[in-house]
Amino acid sequence: MSAHRVLLEVCVDTPAGLAAAIAGGADRVELCSALALQGLTPAPGLMAQAASAPIPVYPMIRPRHGDFCYDARDLDAMRRDIDAVRGYGLPGVTIGASQANGALDLKVLRKLVEQAEGLGTTLHRAFDVVPDMSEALEIAVELGFERVLTSGGALSALDATDRLAALVEQAGERISIMAGAGVRPGNIAELVRRTGVREAHGSFGGPVPGADPRSQLGAMGFVPPELRDTSQAAVAEAVKALRAL
């Protein structure tokens, strides 16, 4: 058995996905819109629904698609979104910001963390593009983040297990390393065994019925090539794999 119970965070972007993550046994939810773009700030209505969730829900604070380099207008929107999260009574936020060279933007992050005072904070995968992960981890610790969500800089966390293990060792008890990207029920236990992470993150999605991409709605761009949403069964399978460690 693992010395620590490994926590599962599930990222969702719909009301149905939120319900599926909770019913499947997730320990925490990262609440987003547009998971096809790796997650943007969720709509107010979805945050309001999440306020009654029986588990912690951390909304993503990401005002637009593209990079993580934010100007004053972006920062203003993000600070207002953090205030909205607090207003809905949600316990934390997922944030990140980069400089043009990929390094963490300490100036912007300080302002975001300050705005989020009293809330939990996760540093998102802006961490995965930094030039020096060891240095970036120390910055995250200094800023007071609870955890870092990272794939170890790889497309899949399973492809960077040595790096993730090194980050876990460096972090010690100061901050949690949460492995994400390419995490599925069939590989989550192996990922934990090889890295020592105490938290894992995934979308655990499956295909869902909906409008045919070849329909008029699809031709107009309203329907993606494949409709996916959080699968309660996949979440439950991942939870079962973790509990067996």
From Swiss-Prot:
Pfam families in the cross-refs: CutC
Domain of life: Bacteria
Predominant localisation class: cytoplasm
Compartments where located: Cytoplasm
Any GO CC annotation of this UniProt entry: cytoplasm
Keyword set, alphabetical order: Cytoplasm
Keyword Cytoplasm tagged: yes
GO molecular function: copper ion binding
InterPro entries: CutC-like (IPR005627), CutC-like_dom_sf (IPR036822)
PANTHER family: COPPER HOMEOSTASIS PROTEIN CUTC, COPPER HOMEOSTASIS PROTEIN CUTC HOMOLOG
Similarity annotation: Belongs to the CutC family.
Name of the protein described by the UniProt record: PF03932 family protein CutC
Organism: Caulobacter vibrioides (strain NA1000 / CB15N)
